[in-house]
């Protein structure tokens, strides 16, 4: 299956807000669908920078950089976005977009170890040049910690019995082995959902530190945005969406009075204005079922107070 970018036009249009030039960042290049559309809307003076840590994504990005001198790829996690941009002399940008989660090619390639639908080595690393594989991590993690991770990151109600079964199995080498253990341990299957779905999601999030990276990325992204610059982020599950929602809420709400019952003037620390929250259309969901769970949240950088 080729990768189909989710909420493609909605994301790029929300990012540009009718602009045709400027400096932009795609924080999750993937296979470049959003970046290519963005470049097609921009004039010759614009610049687009993209981040990714997946070696296969970097190959696609390197080819695009050869085709289009306005584009630069940076081999790094978006959690390092501010530091990496400052290293190349970019202090502020007009827009930042991110498409979170695993891309279709990663899921479809058995050797990447993300999918329970195809047998492959139990890997799951976004950047397979460093860090523990899922197989190595499962050997090291304590049963109680594993149960908590499956519960928190997979929102799996049977996390304890699944964690117990995984740890009792000992060394696991393939995705099929893990999927079968989870399937056997799971007492109640959800309609239209493989019983290993939530557990695989939880392990992937844990070994790639996905939620940690999002929490680090969001405030840095706002730091980089110019006034009226846009932040457009696509999430695919409730954990990601909750983080983004809470962050935008916090950055767009007046701080509560903490005057211990005494009158105190509120300080306006708001940095963002909510713009929109968008779901994929029925037509897009039919064409690309993966888009069913996707949410796009858009916010705009406010003018700096006292500037």
Swiss-Prot record:
Its main location: cytoplasm. It catalyses: cytidine(1402) in 16S rRNA + S-adenosyl-L-methionine = N(4)-methylcytidine(1402) in 16S rRNA + S-adenosyl-L-homocysteine + H(+). GO terms for cellular component: cytoplasm. S-adenosyl-L-methionine binds at residues 32-34, 52, 78, 99, 106. GO terms for molecular function: rRNA (cytosine-N4-)-methyltransferase activity. Pfam families: Methyltransf_5. Belongs to the methyltransferase superfamily. RsmH family. Specifically methylates the N4 position of cytidine in position 1402 (C1402) of 16S rRNA. NCBIfam families: 16S rRNA (cytosine(1402)-N(4))-methyltransferase RsmH (TIGR00006). This is Ribosomal RNA small subunit methyltransferase H. It comes from Acinetobacter baumannii (strain ATCC 17978 / DSM 105126 / CIP 53.77 / LMG 1025 / NCDC KC755 / 5377). The gene is rsmH.
């Amino acid at each position: 299956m080729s990768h189909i970018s989710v909420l493609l036009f909605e994301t790029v249009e929300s990012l540009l807000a009718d602009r045709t030039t400027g400096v932009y960042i795609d924080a999750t290049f993937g296979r470049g669908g959003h970046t290519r559309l963005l470049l097609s809307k921009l004039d010759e003076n614009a610049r687009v920078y993209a981040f990714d840590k997946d070696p296969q994504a970097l190959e696609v990005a390197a080819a695009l950089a050869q085709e289009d001198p306005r584009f630069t790829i940076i081999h790094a996690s978006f959690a390092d976005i501010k530091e990496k941009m400052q290293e190349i002399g970019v202090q502020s940008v007009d827009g930042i977009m991110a498409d979170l989660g695993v891309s279709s090619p990663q899921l479809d390639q058995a050797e990447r170890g993300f999918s329970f639908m195809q047998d492959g080595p139990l890997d799951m690393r976004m950047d397979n040049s460093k860090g523990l594989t899922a197989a190595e991590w499962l050997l090291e993690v304590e049963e109680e910690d594993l149960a908590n991770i499956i519960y928190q990151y997979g929102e799996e109600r049977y996390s304890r019995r699944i964690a117990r079964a995984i740890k009792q199995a000992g060394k696991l080498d393939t995705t099929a082995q893990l999927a079968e253990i989870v399937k056997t341990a799971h007492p109640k299957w959800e309609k239209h959902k493989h019983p290993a779905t939530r557990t695989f999601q939880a392990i992937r999030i844990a070994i790639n530190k996905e939620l940690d990276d999002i929490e680090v990325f969001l405030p840095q992204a706002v730091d980089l945005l110019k006034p009226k610059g846009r932040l457009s982020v696509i999430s695919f599950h409730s954990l990601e969406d909750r983080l983004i929602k809470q962050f935008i809420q916090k950055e767009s709400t007046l701080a509560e009075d903490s005057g211990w019952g005494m009158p105190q003037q509120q300080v306006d620390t708001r940095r963002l204005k909510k713009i929109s929250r968008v779901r994929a259309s029925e037509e897009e969901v039919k064409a690309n079922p993966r888009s069913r769970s996707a949410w796009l949240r858009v916010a705009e950088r406010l003018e700096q107070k006292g500037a």
